[in-house]
């Protein structure tokens, strides 16, 4: 990904699942990110958007599943996910908009 002016172009959405929800206690957050972004860009974007200190970023490319439809087969789109670990002492990210 070339130069991006807005960090919100890199971080697309948080992943809300049972596994990602259980990792919130360990200050580990999961986001869907732009497929061309790298770990450094993801770290800078998270730090700018949420004003937190990031300790590490792990990424995973997930292939889209082949799904059967009424008229044949289709394919879900592939996504890239970032698993972000916050530094110790960093404030938690409020993903759900409710008091903790």
Swiss-Prot record:
Subunit structure: Part of the 50S ribosomal subunit. Contacts protein L29, and trigger factor when it is bound to the ribosome.
GO MF annotation, one: structural constituent of ribosome
Name assigned to this protein: Large ribosomal subunit protein uL23
HAMAP family in alphabetical order: Ribosomal_uL23_B (MF_01369_B)
Function: One of the early assembly proteins it binds 23S rRNA. One of the proteins that surrounds the polypeptide exit tunnel on the outside of the ribosome. Forms the main docking site for trigger factor binding to the ribosome.
Entries under SUPFAM superfamilies matching the protein: Ribosomal proteins S24e, L23 and L15e
Transferase in keyword set: no
Cellular component per GO, a single term: ribonucleoprotein complex
Domain of life: Bacteria
Pfam family, one: Ribosomal_L23
Annotated signal peptide: none
Similarity section: Belongs to the universal ribosomal protein uL23 family.
Gene Ontology BP term (one): translation
Gene symbol of the encoding locus: rplW
Keywords of this entry: Ribonucleoprotein, Ribosomal protein, RNA-binding, rRNA-binding
């Amino acid at each position: 990904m070339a130069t991006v002016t807005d960090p919100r172009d890199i971080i697309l959405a948080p992943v809300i699942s049972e596994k990602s929800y259980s990792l919130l206690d360990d200050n580990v957050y999961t986001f869907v990110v732009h497929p061309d972004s790298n770990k450094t860009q993801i770290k800078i974007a998270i730090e700018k958007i949420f004003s937190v200190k990031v300790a590490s970023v792990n990424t995973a490319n997930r292939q889209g599943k082949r799904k059967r439809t009424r008229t044949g087969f289709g394919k879900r789109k592939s996504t890239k996910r970032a698993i972000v670990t916050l530094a110790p002492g960093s404030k938690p990210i409020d993903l759900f908009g409710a008091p903790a």
